[in-house]
Amino acid sequence: MTPKQRRLLEVVACYWQGRGYSPSLRELVRLLPLSSTSVAAYNLRRLRSLGLVTFRPGTARTLCLTAAGWAEAGIAPPLAMASQA
């Protein structure tokens, strides 16, 4: 995992923790900052290939961290997500 991907994972985890849903690609571009939504999507696909996140392409706000993703980010999952695992 690259430093940019680690930061992306941490930002997604913090966003989920604070709001209870995932950020959009445009929000990730603003929060990190990244140069484009395609850069965000590429890095999310890499995190998915590492087994750290899941999402449904083409569907808004379906990005979720896996148990391994939460552990890697060093952040406890929100209570509602922990009870679903």
Label for each model-derived stretch:
Residues 39-40:
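Helix-turn-helix DNA-binding helix
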